[in-house]
C-alpha cells in the first residue's frame, strides 16, 4: 500500500456515499480529534439526502474502503454533528512512518513544464529597498517550491557585477549571475529592427526635448485595445524605449529559449492547471513598479507575438511599510539591523554569547529566518508593516522564524542526546521500523503531529506551488505564505507536545517500545522540518 493522503481519503469517503460533491471534511482541531477524524456535517447531508440520512448500506461500507492512498478507517457513526469516522490509528502510524515524508512521488520523476520567474527589482542601479527584497524572496521561494514539484525554473534577470549583492548572499537567495554576452547583443539588435517595422512605434533622434537614451516611442494603448487585452492599467499609453528596455526583453526571450524541449509539455496539473504546451512567464513585482512592468509586458507582446508572450502573468506584492524610520532604510541596513536585534535578543535569553564561528552562524541563520518569515508569512497581496524597534524581534514569539528554528534545533538535540546514550549503553539502538509498536502512541499530541502535519505535508507543498489556471486577466495569486504558516503552526503543536512529554525516559526495557515509537514519529517530524525549511533556503540548526 502506498503513502496515505488526505485528498484520496476524502474522495473515497465521498464516493462511498455515492456523491461526487465534497460532503466530508478533515478535522484538525485537537478537541474534535478526540472523537472523530473526518466529518460529513449534518447540513451537507441534509442538502444531499432526503431527511439528511445517507443510505445505511453506504455508511456500513465505509470501514471497508481501500486504496493505495486511502487511510485505514474504523466504523462510521451517526452523531448530532453528522456522520463521523475515525482512522485506525496504529495502522496509520505504521503506513506513514515507514517511508520518509516529503514531496509526492510524482515530483521526484522527470521534470515537466517550465516557468520563467522575472523579478524586475533586480534591474537598474538603485540599491535594494525592503519592498524589493519582498518580491525577490517570494520569487526565490516560489522557484524552490516549483522545483519540488518537478517543474523547470528559469530566473531572470541575471545579477550583474555593477551592484553589490551582499544582502542576497546573506539571505542565501539562489539567483544566477552573468553578463549575457553576444547572444543578448544580437537579440537587442533584432528587437530594434522589429521596432523599426512596428506601425505603433516611432524612432527618436537625440536632441532638445528628447530624454537621454530614448531610441523609440511606442503607443501601447492602441495595441491593448486592438487585441482586447484585459486587466491592464487604463493609463498605459506612450512608452519611451531605451536600450535597457530592449535588453530586459532580450533576457526574457533568452530564458524562454533555454527551456529544454523536454520542459515544454504542459506543467503538472497540480501546479498550473490547463496550461498550454509552452513555458509560462511570471513577473514577480512590487505594487509600486507594477505599471512599468505592464508597459514592458505589452511591448514584448508587440515585438514577439509568440504563445509565450500571451502567457505572461503578474504576481504583485503588496506594499512594505516601515514604521518609525529615522531615514529611508535599504535592504542591507534592514538585514544588519535585524542581525543586531537578533544577537541582543539571544543574549537576553541565553546570556553573553561566545564570539566564535559557530555562534556567528547561528545568529546569521536566525536572522535569515526572521526576515524570510517576516516577508513571506503574509499573503503576497497584503501589506507588510516592518517594525524596526528593538523589541520587535524576539526569540520567544511563537509567530517568528526564530521560534521555528528553535524547535528544529530541539529535535536535533533530542536525537543527539539519544545517540550519545546509545553509545554509552544506556539505550539499545532504534530498531527497524517494522519492529516498532505504534499502538504505544496514544498521546493526543502524537496523533495531532501525524494527522495535521505528516499526513498532509506533500499536499501542502503541492498547494504552495500551485498557480491558478490561465485567465483573461494578467494578475495571478499564489499561496506563497503556506509553508511559513505551516511551519509556525507545526512548531506550536510540536512545542506543546515536547514540553508535556518526556521522550527519553528511564532506561527500563518495558518503556523502550513507547520511546522507540516516539523517536520514529519525531524523526519523521524532524525530516519534515528540514524539507519545508529547504524551500526557504534555511539550513536546519543543530543547536541554539
Predicted regions and their residues:
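Non-catalytic interaction-recognition regions
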Residues: 1-544
Amino acid at each position: 500500500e502506498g503513502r496515505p493522503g488526505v485528498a484520496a481519503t476524502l474522495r473515497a469517503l465521498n464516493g462511498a456515499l455515492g456523491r461526487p460533491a465534497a460532503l466530508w471534511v478533515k478535522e484538525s482541531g485537537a478537541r474534535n480529534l478526540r472523537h472523530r477524524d473526518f466529518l460529513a456535517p449534518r447540513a451537507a447531508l441534509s442538502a444531499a439526502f432526503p431527511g439528511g440520512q445517507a443510505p445505511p448500506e453506504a455508511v456500513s461500507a465505509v470501514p471497508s474502503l481501500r486504496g493505495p492512498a486511502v487511510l485505514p478507517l474504523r466504523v462510521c457513526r451517526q452523531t448530532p454533528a453528522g456522520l463521523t469516522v475515525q482512522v485506525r490509528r496504529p495502522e496509520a502510524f505504521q503506513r506513514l512512518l515507514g517511508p520518509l515524508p516529503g514531496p509526492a512521488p510524482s515530483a521526484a520523476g522527470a521534470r515537466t513544464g517550465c516557468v520563467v520567474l522575472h523579478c524586475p527589482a533586480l534591474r537598474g542601479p538603485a540599491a535594494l529597498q525592503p519592498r524589493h527584497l519582498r518580491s525577490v524572496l517570494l520569487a526565490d521561494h516560489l522557484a524552490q517550491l516549483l522545483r519540488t514539484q518537478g517543474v523547470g525554473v528559469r530566473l531572470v534577470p541575471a545579477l550583474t557585477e555593477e551592484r553589490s549583492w551582499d544582502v542576497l548572499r546573506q539571505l542565501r537567495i539562489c539567483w544566477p549571475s552573468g553578463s549575457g554576452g553576444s547572444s543578448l547583443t544580437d537579440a537587442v539588435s533584432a528587437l530594434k529592427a522589429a521596432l523599426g517595422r512596428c506601425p505603433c512605434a516611432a524612432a527618436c533622434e537625440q536632441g532638445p526635448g528628447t530624454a537621454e537614451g530614448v531610441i523609440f516611442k511606442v503607443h501601447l494603448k492602441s495595441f491593448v485595445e486592438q487585441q482586447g487585452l484585459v486587466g491592464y492599467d487604463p493609463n498605459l499609453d506612450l512608452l519611451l524605449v531605451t536600450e535597457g528596455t530592449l535588453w530586459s526583453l532580450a533576457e526574457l526571450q533568452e530564458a524562454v529559449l533555454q527551456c529544454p524541449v523536454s520542459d515544454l509539455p504542459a506543467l503538472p496539473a497540480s501546479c498550473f492547471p490547463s496550461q498550454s504546451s509552452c513555458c509560462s512567464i511570471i513577473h514577480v513585482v512590487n505594487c509600486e513598479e507594477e505599471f512599468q512592468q505592464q508597459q514592458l509586458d505589452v511591448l514584448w507582446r508587440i515585438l514577439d507575438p509568440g504563445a509565450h508572450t500571451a502567457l505572461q502573468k503578474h504576481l504583485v506584492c503588496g506594499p512594505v511599510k516601515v514604521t518609525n524610520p529615522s531615514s529611508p532604510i535599504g535592504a542591507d541596513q534592514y538585514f544588519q539591523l535585524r542581525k543586531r536585534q537578533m544577537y541582543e535578543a539571544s543574549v537576553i535569553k541565553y546570556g553573553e554569547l561566545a564570539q566564535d564561528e559557530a555562534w556567528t552562524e547561528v545568529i546569521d541563520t536566525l536572522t535569515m529566518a526572521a526576515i524570510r518569515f517576516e516577508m513571506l508569512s503574509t499573503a503576497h497581496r497584503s501589506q507588510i508593516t516592518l517594525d524596526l524597534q528593538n523589541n520587535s524581534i524576539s526569540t520567544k514569539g511563537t509567530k517568528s522564524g526564530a521560534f521555528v528554528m528553535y524547535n528544529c534545533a530541539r529535535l536535533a538535540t533530542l536525537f543527539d542526546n539519544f545517540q550519545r546514550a546509545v553509545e554509552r549503553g544506556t539505550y539499545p539502538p532504534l530498531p527497524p521500523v517494522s519492529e516498532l509498536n505504534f499502538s504505544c502512541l496514544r498521546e493526543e499530541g502524537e496523533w495531532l503531529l501525524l494527522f495535521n502535519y505528516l499526513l498532509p505535508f506533500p499536499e501542502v507543498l503541492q498547494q504552495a506551488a500551485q498557480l491558478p489556471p490561465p485567465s483573461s486577466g494578467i494578475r495571478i495569486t499564489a499561496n506563497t505564505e503556506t509553508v511559513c504558516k505551516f511551519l509556525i503552526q507545526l512548531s506550536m503543536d510540536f512545542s506543546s507536545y515536547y514540553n508535556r512529554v518526556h521522550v527519553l525516559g528511564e532506561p527500563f526495557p518495558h518503556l523502550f517500545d513507547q520511546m522507540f515509537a516516539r523517536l520514529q514519529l519525531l524523526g519523521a517530524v524532524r525530516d519534515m522540518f528540514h524539507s519545508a525549511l529547504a524551500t526557504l533556503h534555511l539550513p536546519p540548526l543543530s543547536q541554539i
